[in-house]
Amino acid sequence: MIKNQYINSDESVFNDAKALFNLNKNILLKGPTGSGKTKLAETLSAAVNTPMHQVNCSVDLDAESLLGFKTIKTNEQGQQEIVFIDGPVIKAMREGHILYIDEINMAKPETLPILNGVLDYRRQLTNPFTGEVIKAAPGFNVIAAINEGYVGTLPMNEALKNRFVVIQVDYIDGDILKDVIKQQSQLQDDAIIEQIIKFNEDLRTMSKQGQISEEAASIRALIDLSDLITVMPIERAIKRTIIDKLEDEREQQAIKNAIELNF
């Protein structure tokens, strides 16, 4: 068993992702923040025994962040020379590894067309910094993740989206969520786990209604909360892992109200 693997009662999510990987299809994981998209990519990487190189997208992402950069290095003869340091895209291509592009719709649209040749049948790239044409080694594949409707995201270009096959990754719940908490956190007390799962369900409802951000109701936040509960009171653990991350006082108060109802 893969340690801290992605778990979902809908086995088709992982099985389809693995099938798409074996078909050398680009995979786009779409779902709310903290639903386990990165964990799914990591589990797939381990299952197919292929290392993964990650790009974390933001509005500041540029070609150097993707491809690499030039720098000055002293060679064995003591002379300085200009060398190119491969970035995550080129590393993954050369080694036949997985390229994971997280929050791809956080990047500026004008940054991503440089990957068009990487994402289509050519699987190749002309490095604009060196002129080298890089052809991906066998085994290379691309997985991207998208948080639709999240603050700071941009609509994904249709031409780019059409280069992927989409898998929806929703939040998990019930017994599966209980198993994930036990597997990925220090908390093992069933009664407390059921309490915080109910609390998390309330947060998800509030998130869907626009009262709080998605991140506050994420699986990631729940795992952090589960760990902290083993060393401090529940209310303080919630404050540290969820409330103190929020800037909006109305969101903070909404969660405090949920605490009073659940604990």
UniProtKB/Swiss-Prot annotation:
InterPro entries xrefs: AAA+_ATPase (IPR003593), ATPase_dyneun-rel_AAA (IPR011704), CbbQ/NirQ/NorQ/GpvN (IPR050764), CbbQ_C (IPR013615), ClpA/B (IPR001270), P-loop_NTPase (IPR027417)
Signal peptide start-end: none
Residues bound to ATP: G31, P32, T33, G34, S35, G36, K37, T38
Pfam families listed in its UniProt record: AAA_5 (PF07728), CbbQ_C (PF08406)
UniProt keyword annotations, A-Z: ATP-binding, Nucleotide-binding
GO molecular-function terms, A-Z: ATP binding; ATP hydrolysis activity
Protein family (similarity comment): Belongs to the CbbQ/NirQ/NorQ/GpvN family.
Name the UniProt record assigns to this protein: Uncharacterized protein SH1500
Provenance organism: Staphylococcus haemolyticus (strain JCSC1435)
